[in-house]
Swiss-Prot record:
UniProt-recorded name of the protein: 2-C-methyl-D-erythritol 4-phosphate cytidylyltransferase
Keywords tagged on the record: Isoprene biosynthesis, Nucleotidyltransferase, Transferase
UniProt cross-references to Gene3D superfamilies, sorted A to Z: Spore Coat Polysaccharide Biosynthesis Protein SpsA, Chain A
Superkingdom of this protein's organism: Bacteria
Site (Positions MEP for the nucleophilic attack): R150, K206
Catalytic activity: 2-C-methyl-D-erythritol 4-phosphate + CTP + H(+) = 4-CDP-2-C-methyl-D-erythritol + diphosphate
Protein EC: 2.7.7.60
One BP annotation, GO: isopentenyl diphosphate biosynthetic process, methylerythritol 4-phosphate pathway
Protein role: Catalyzes the formation of 4-diphosphocytidyl-2-C-methyl-D-erythritol from CTP and 2-C-methyl-D-erythritol 4-phosphate (MEP).
Family to which this protein belongs: Belongs to the IspD/TarI cytidylyltransferase family. IspD subfamily.
Record has Nucleotidyltransferase as a keyword: yes
Length: 226
């Protein structure tokens, strides 16, 4: 299985002046935890890190004689463009790909393995977790419009996995139609292509705010304590 790690995050919501993936988490940069989990996965055989040139040296510095091929791929100005760049940077023999947010640094090796097994069996999927809160749809005036059925709501996460050829076709259609999507599953939805959810649990958070960093520190401490 080939893996693309989206690593072009900013530090704006962190109040930081650099890529949030380079902020310290339990003594190491956030991105180091993400890469380590991918390297420990039994099914991941090739890793592409998609990011901006300004972060290249710092991100690659976290690698210490990696056990698998790890390649740097120059990203675009948006996540959608960066995924396109990542797809272009895949080896010719790549048939399936997982795409993972570098900021989801609590993903464990077994999650990558579970996702890879489903994708290699021919099913597009996303890691996700059922929504536990009651969700309200609210208008621009701040007034509640309605309450979606919580039993049908899942919070999308990563990894997200697809057949490479089909994902490339989807992105080509998005470019032709001028579509903007926030993840690849949304692209599949527009095209009417099925995507399965795989329950990854609530710990697979995306580190975006200082509070998220605190939560991630606590989770890592619990895992370390065994």
């Amino acid at each position: 299985m080939h893996l693309l790690i989206a690593a072009a995050g900013s530090g704006r919501r962190m109040g930081a002046d650099r890529n949030k993936l380079l902020l310290p988490l339990a003594g190491r940069p956030v991105i180091a935890w993400t890469i380590e989990a991918a390297l420990r996965s039994e099914r991941i055989e090739w890793i592409g890190i998609v990011g901006q040139e300004v972060d290249r040296e710092a991100i690659l510095a976290v690698l210490d004689e990696p056990s698998k091929p790890v390649h740097w791929i120059q990203g675009g100005s948006t996540r959608q463009e960066s995924v396109l760049c990542g797809l272009a940077g895949l080896p010719e023999q790549a048939r399936h790909v997982l795409i993972h947010d570098g900021a989801r640094c609590l993903a464990e090796p077994k999650l990558f393995d579970r996702c890879a097994a489903v994708v290699e069996d021919g099913t597009a999927l996303i890691a996700a977790t059922p929504v536990s809160d009651t969700i309200k749809r609210v208008g621009s005036d701040g007034v509640i419009r309605d309450t979606p059925d919580r039993s049908e709501l899942w919070a999308a996460q990563t990894p997200q996995g697809f057949a490479v050829d089909q994902l490339r076709r989807g992105h080509a259609e998005a470019v032709a139609q001028g579509w903007t999507v926030t993840d690849d599953a949304s692209l599949y939805e527009r095209l009417g292509w099925p995507v399965q959810v795989l329950d990854a649990g609530p710990a697979n958070i995306k580190v975006t705010t200082p509070f998220d960093l605190t939560v991630a520190e606590a989770v890592l401490a619990l895992r370390s304590a065994g």
